[in-house]
Amino acid sequence: MRPEDASSRWIRPREPEEAAAIAIVAYLRGYGPASVDNFHNWLSRGRVSTRQVRKWFASVGDRLREVEVGGERRYVLAEDLDELLSTKPTKAVRLLPGFDQYVLGPGTDDPHVLPAARRRAVSQQSGWIAPIVVAGGVVRGTWKIAADNVQVAWFSEAGAVPRSGLRAEVERLSTILGRDLGLAVN
């Protein structure tokens, strides 16, 4: 049965150019500032040409603003620019689950989110994405639960371990899971 025959509420799929503009705006709302490559990888992992993706970005036009992040051109929604510019860097520590959108959105190959040297620690065999420790907006380690402990593998180059922030996150996780958990840092 064809979808339009199955439901009177069926809406025809949009043309690719129209759908792309909607997707770019939604993507940048969630993950901006982001590069064309970030969006391209998130959308299709190379199934659409880079040239086509660039055309789609150009078609969004004045709704986007270019910004520089670490010497690279990124895009943000024009309406979000002032808020972005007034945002202060965070020192927050978070334990995020495997396959979290924090790394899937920009992609594990974005060095602003995940240091390149640690990509294999997060993006593992058979497509597994490990649970991550984010501190100061950057992936600083991985974690897992073993017995009654949250075992954190803190990246040595990430500096001092933020133990109080990690303890607070383990406490939060304990509440969510309904069981007491300890903290072990490697």
Place the predicted regions along the sequence by residue.
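Long, low-complexity intrinsically disordered regions
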Residues: 1-103, 108-186
